[in-house]
Amino acid sequence: MGLPWYRVHTVVLNDPGRLLAVHIMHTALVSGWAGSMALYELAVFDPSDPVLDPMWRQGMFVIPFMTRLGITDSWGGWSISGGTVTNPGIWSYEGVAGAHIVFSGLCFLAAIWHWVYWDLAIFSDDRTGKPSLDLPKIFGIHLFLAGVACFGFGAFHVTGLYGPGIWVSDPYGLTGKVQAVNPAWGAEGFDPFVPGGIASHHIAAGTLGILAGLFHLSVRPPQRLYKGLRMGNIETVLSSSIAAVFFAAFVVAGTMWYGSATTPIELFGPTRYQWDQGYFQQEIYRRVSNGLAENLSLSEAWSKIPEKLAFYDYIGNNPAKGGLFRAGSMDNGDGIAVGWLGHPVFRDKEGRELFVRRMPTFFETFPVVLVDEEGIVRADVPFRRAESKYSVEQVGVTVEFYGGELNGVSYSDPATVKKYARRSQLGEIFELDRATLKSDGVFRSSPRGWFTFGHATFALLFFFGHIWHGARTLFRDVFAGIDPDLDAQVEFGTFQKVGDPTTRKQAV
């Protein structure tokens, strides 16, 4: 049977045993990929510096998902938070990866068994002797089981009742750890940044799924609805399943790109909007102001800023700075961060503090402009020196560092001042090692960007798949050229034109 590539899946039409087999094999492939990818990432992951070289800077993709579900320790003796562990047990990164690979192997064997033993009695209709599936009943079974799993995850795993809890952190991604979460049943549960909503929504959705599953198991669909929605056709199942998948993909693309409690910045990196809104910059200035109010010196106030917080306030960690075809991790772009140089404070010769205007997300280059606290331009690095009025040399700009490696160091040399002014456009200034990985200096996106791009793209493709298969199943009679209300038996050769009673052949 010579089928074109886009029609090969018709071989499992009207063949429930082999339809089951190919789905089990698909599960084997997905689980096997997840386990293998986890082992590869663990082989290349460097856990030595969770502050300046976290998993998202290294381009890890599956490790963050394991971590947010409660896995933090490795058989290699390290913990994701930077400590050491002696007995991580079976539920370590390697243990979970191994479990997926073992499960993949079992699914592989099950798929082969079901492919060979496809003609099982359970798939046969007693009345006709032909293969058939009771699709409404199967829908009820799956809905019930999915509801049980959903409820169990929310009520036991997330709450810590029987499980580790989930990754929870503060709004600035500094104190993250795995902990039990109490369900949030009030209005706050609808805030996408409240972890309690994850528990309560899984409990509620799971309960609804269990009840809906029992309903569909005990109540048969009305005949008109059954026929109208083509509930006896397996392509209806395909169409509605694709709809569920593309809807979920669109939702998670949104929660990943815009941020939520399910996508902590410690695991996936900051969002672009945190750079656009100066989110971390405001928090840093708030902490420094509080320090000054407590009679700390400027140097002491800046020295109390966590290096982790300063690192978030750097444009190289903005997932929107990567290019679509720039493969590789962030570390392969601007390099591995080694240390924070400190916060540069610029002043003109009149003693005014100047602030470098930061580069917007979608600019590759941006003029170096220094403004005072009222937003008035006081200095710049001019394009045409002959016409300049505000050059660093003319204005007499100096720079002094507070906190970090250059704490207390000041420069008045114009070339050095301009160098640090340019680097201040990109946020806080870090020493970056570009030699180790031969980093090319071109920004890359974080796993947050890759996940969003992948899921939004496939969601769009699956949306068209839903429309395609939905139309095929709803208008199957139209495409086949047969009127569903035709009373006469349609047999080959009865009519000159198939299904047209006006062309009935006369028996000779």
From Swiss-Prot:
One of its GO terms (cellular component) is photosystem II. GO terms for biological process: photosynthetic electron transport in photosystem II. Binds multiple chlorophylls. PSII binds additional chlorophylls, carotenoids and specific lipids. The keyword Transmembrane applies. The keyword DNA damage does not apply. Keywords: Chlorophyll, Chloroplast, Chromophore, Membrane, Photosynthesis, Photosystem II, Plastid, Thylakoid, Transmembrane, Transmembrane helix. Gene3D superfamilies: Photosystem II CP47 reaction center protein. It is a multi-pass membrane protein. Coiled coil: none annotated. The chain crosses the membrane at residues 21-36, 101-115, 140-156, 203-218, 237-252, 457-472. GO terms for molecular function: chlorophyll binding; electron transporter, transferring electrons within the cyclic electron transport pathway of photosynthesis activity. Pfam families: PSII. It is found in: Plastid, Chloroplast thylakoid membrane. It comes from the Eukaryota. One of the components of the core complex of photosystem II (PSII). It binds chlorophyll and helps catalyze the primary light-induced photochemical processes of PSII. PSII is a light-driven water:plastoquinone oxidoreductase, using light energy to abstract electrons from H(2)O, generating O(2) and a proton gradient subsequently used for ATP formation. PSII is composed of 1 copy each of membrane proteins PsbA, PsbB, PsbC, PsbD, PsbE, PsbF, PsbH, PsbI, PsbJ, PsbK, PsbL, PsbM, PsbT, PsbX, PsbY, PsbZ, Psb30/Ycf12, at least 3 peripheral proteins of the oxygen-evolving complex and a large number of cofactors. It forms dimeric complexes. Belongs to the PsbB/PsbC family. PsbB subfamily. This is Photosystem II CP47 reaction center protein. It comes from Lolium perenne.
